[in-house]
A protein has these predicted regions:
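Conserved blade-ending motifs and adjacent loop-strand segments that build the rim/top face
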Residues: 331-349
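Bacterial Sec-dependent N-terminal signal peptides
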Residues: 1-21, 373, 449
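C-terminal outer-membrane/trafficking sorting elements
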Residues: 376-384, 388-455
Length: 455
């Protein structure tokens, strides 16, 4: 698999104790992937916006036969199409899975399907049972993320209905299902049941029974972090601010502020409740550097890469950067990955993390190398000459198994070698002139890094 390295630290002339992530190309040839999930087995299921669900095997091979094709039931284009997929917690026993799409009228549909009784890699296209049919006034702001929580309920996030500025004030209207987090019980003989602990459930309560939280603009993907008990919600801003919200899954009825506020900034507060009643984002970012639209991801809870543990991964669609939110709610960005507009993240059944690019049709696996402090103090290692042209020399390396890699300013690995001998030249004549970073790695965790100019 192809590896691409993105350094997420801000390099100065000497950096230690920094971190990097790798994107390994896992699968290619998909059409507009907008969701990645698993059915608690080794397969990945990828939702294509054109109405097709594909299966990817553990080696990255895409099954030739579609798992499901409902292209005739959807409208595909812009922000509309088949957008979400979730497998029932008892999928292995009942074969139920749920999809979120726009029908030809543009309405939001949440429907249940069943897997084939004879082939686990094919769904039964005739098994559709529609649970929700939500009209919406405009083409954009469709939301499109569904997940089961540990309570066994299906959680659904919707957009505010579209246009700009939420002209119908749907997100603040507790009797509209648009701009909301919904929560329903799908283990019902009818379409669904209302959980009795939903905040607006029951007669005489102002608000739709299905609503759990409100005040969302166009949340593009949410996920559950079961370690902390939060839903992580990435909400796309109006024109200036992108936001990340944490929603405790045991706290009902929260108002996330739109259209009254965009991020932490007042947007249109006419008729709004007091600011003190709003729940504001834990992190925001503006549109500097070509950023424009957040794509939500996951808190990493896998075991393979301990240095990523507890960090929330997301992306910006336009800047083609991956963002990482730490436990202090600080954001660090990778360098841009040009040509890949990241549209969704997903997990495998072992909590491995993946990201998809809607325009290139590629799925990448997120991996890492963690750079720590080398046993040799930085002052004992010398890299010379600098600038260099044909050769570079290194002195002071104590670990005979150390490896060297040269990373471009764009974060791409251009050279790697384990042939490091103190005082012996390393040929760099094939590397174009520019600014690079030379990393010495001792195993997986120990490293020295320095800026290198090649002329």
């Amino acid at each position: 698999m192809k590896k691409l390295l993105f350094c997420i630290s801000v390099f100065s002339s000497l950096i230690v104790n920094s971190q990097s992530i790798n994107l390994e190309e896992f699968a290619t040839g998909l059409t507009s992937p907008v969701e990645i999930t698993n059915a608690n087995d080794s397969r990945l299921f990828v939702v294509q916006q054109n109405g097709i669900i594909k299966i990817i095997q553990p080696n990255g091979t895409i099954n030739a036969t579609n798992f499901l094709n409902i292209g005739t039931k959807i409208i595909f284009g812009g922000e509309r199409g088949l957008l979400g997929l979730a497998f029932h917690p008892q999928y292995s026993a009942n074969g139920y899975f749920f999809v979120y799409y726009n029908n030809p009228s543009g309405n939001i549909i949440v429907a249940r399907y069943s897997v084939s009784s004879t082939d686990p890699n094919v769904a039964d296209p005739a098994s559709e049972k529609i649970l929700l049919n939500i009209p919406k006034p405009f083409d954009n702001h469709n939301g499109g993320s569904i997940h089961f929580a540990p309570d066994g309920k299906l959680w659904i996030i919707t957009g505010d209905g579209g246009s700009g500025g939420d002209p119908n004030n749907n997100a603040q209207n507790k009797n509209s299902l648009l701009g909301k987090m919904l929560r329903i019980d799908v283990d019902a003989t009818g379409p669904y049941n209302i959980p009795p602990d939903n905040p607006f459930a029951g007669a005489g309560v102002d608000g739709a029974d299905e609503i759990w939280a409100y005040g969302l603009r166009n949340a593009w993907k949410f996920s559950f972090d079961l370690t902390t008990g939060n839903a992580m919600i990435a909400d796309v801003g109006q024109g200036a601010i992108e936001e990340i919200n944490k929603m405790p899954i045991t706290t009902a009825g929260l108002n996330y502020g739109w259209r009254c506020y965009e991020g932490n900034n007042a947007y249109n507060t006419a008729g709004c409740a007091a600011q003190s009643t709003m729940t504001f984002p834990v992190a925001v970012y503006d549109h500097s550097g070509g950023k424009c639209s957040i794509t939500g991801g996951y808190v990493y809870r896998g075991t393979q890469y301990p240095s990523l543990q507890g960090k929330y991964f997301f992306a910006d669609y336009c800047s083609t950067q991956i963002g990482i939110l730490d436990s202090n709610n600080a954001i660090t960005w990778t360098t841009p990955y040009s040509g890949n507009n990241f549209s969704t993240f997903g997990e495998d059944y072992q909590k491995g993390l993946y990201v998809a690019a809607v325009n290139s049709g590629k799925i990448f696996k997120v991996t890492t190398g963690t750079l720590g402090t080398q046993e040799s103090s930085p002052g004992t290692i010398k890299v010379y000459p600098n600038p260099a042209s044909k050769e570079v020399f290194i002195d002071g390396v104590k670990d005979k198994k150390a490896t060297l890699e040269i990373i471009s300013a764009e974060g791409r690995k251009v050279m790697e070698t384990d042939q490091i001998i103190n005082g012996k030249g390393i040929n760099i004549s094939g590397i174009p002139a520019g600014v690079y970073y030379i990393n010495l790695k001792s195993g997986e965790l120990k490293s020295y890094s320095q800026k290198l100019i090649i002329k």
